[in-house]
Regions:
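Short low-complexity, flexible loop/linker segments enriched in glycine and/or proline
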Residues: 125-130, 164-166, 214
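Acyl-donor binding region in acyl/amide transferases
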Residues: 73-156, 310-313, 318-357
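Long, hydrophobic, well-ordered secondary-structure blocks that form the structural core
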Residues: 134, 158-165
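A conserved beta-strand-loop-helix scaffold within acyl/acetyltransferase catalytic domains
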Residues: 9-55, 59-71, 145-156, 166-337
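Short, Lys/Arg-enriched N-terminal segments with co-localized hydrophobic residues
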Residues: 1-4
Length: 357
């Protein structure tokens, strides 16, 4: 199909994959790996890889998912696509017109496009820093008859992202220094508790899934079956990082025992030593600390954990292109006090930092 010198070509996934990371807006939802995963799921009708050429050169490409609408009609969906240079939108009108005509030839009733673009940026206080960043692109779509609205079916994927830019830091220590005092205290505290992070292998994804399902039940969202995540891991390989934060139980018990003995020794030394004006207060403070450690020990016994690891939080991160994206995940509500998610995300920030370096 050729329109205004833009040619739309259907290609196999292997050919598509050769150039899929050549764009600034490269993302895993517009990858051949994701297309293969979608095809492996029975509820997906058809998935197609397209490239757009001008004068023999590829100027864009996209993965399209075709779905049934009201049993009779078919609709086309582009999540985080198409891939192209949005900084120079000269090709965009012709590209979209060519795509529309291509889909009409396939008797597609509707086309939904969710470009991977930032339109509004807010800070931590939800104050608007930048808006209408994609205004020029939006105008192109409007001229071609597209209506702009929030698709509730795709809101969890394309609505908002919490982004941590790290390109201004040269080391992880610099990034840590920029954190708030309270966050730095939490990282230090949770590390002292012997909370650790590891990457799960394909054989252990049930640990991730168990936490995800319980989080979904608690918060009221649906999740794919375990086989979806196993297939995702097979398709993306090392780019799909299933991360688990867990409590090292023997080390945690040793930490409690060490502190209990330390405060018992301190209290006895204060009682045996010279009784000064502030000694009584020091003893009371030490006894409060001692009781808190005994309380933690008794609380740990109620967990009835028989293994050396107590799973706390689990997240799936997609390491793709210039991004590391938190895609799915959750926490065990009973163990939020150990801060598993905090340390897990800090670990992945450091991973992303090492990747940049």
């Amino acid at each position: 199909m050729i329109v205004m010198s833009i040619m739309v070509k259907s290609v196999n996934f292997d050919d598509y994959q050769k150039t899929q990371t050549s764009y600034k807006d490269t993302n895993f939802l517009q990858s051949a790996e994701m297309a293969k995963l979608q095809l492996s799921r029975n509820h997906i009708g058809e998935v197609e890889a397209l490239v757009f050429e001008r004068d023999g050169l590829i100027v864009g490409q996209t993965i399209i998912v075709y779905r049934r609408s009201f049993r009779i009609f078919r609709k086309a969906l582009l999540l985080h696509g198409p891939l192209l240079d949005y900084n120079s939108i000269t090709d965009l009108p012709d590209l979209l017109e060519a795509l529309i005509l291509y889909l009409k030839k396939k008797n597609i009733a509707s086309l939904s496009i969710h470009p991977y673009l930032t339109n509004l940026i807010r800070n931590e206080e939800l104050e608007i820093l930048k808006e209408d960043k994609a205004d020029e692109v939006s105008k192109v779509f409007e001229k071609l008859g597209f209506e702009q609205y929030l698709d509730p079916e795709q809101a969890l994927v394309v609505n908002q992202m919490f982004v941590k830019p790290i390109d201004t830091f040269t080391t992880s220590d610099e990034m840590l220094a920029a954190f708030s005092p309270s966050l730095k205290r939490d990282l230090k505290k949770f590390t002292a508790l012997n909370v650790k992070v590891e990457e799960l292998s394909e054989d252990n994804l049930d640990q991730f899934y168990d936490i995800l399902v319980r989080t979904a039940e608690r918060k009221g969202f649906s999740v794919h079956p375990l086989t979806y995540f196993q297939d995702l891991k097979r398709n993306f390989g090392k780019s799909a990082k299933f991360m688990l934060a867990y409590l090292d139980c023997p080390a945690y018990l040793a930490y409690l025992d060490e502190n209990i003995k330390s405060f018992e020794t301190k209290i006895q030394a204060l009682k045996d030593g010279p009784q000064k004006k502030r000694t009584k207060g020091q003893i009371a403070d030490a006894q409060d600390q001692l009781r808190s450690y005994y309380k933690r020990l008794e609380q740990f016994k109620t967990y009835q954990n028989t293994g050396d690891k107590l799973p706390l939080s689990a997240y799936l991160f997609m390491d793709y292109g210039s991004e590391v994206v938190s895609f799915y995940g959750g926490n065990d509500e009973a163990y939020l006090n150990f801060g598993g998610a905090v340390l897990l995300h800090w670990e992945m920030l450091q991973y992303a930092m090492r990747k940049v370096i």
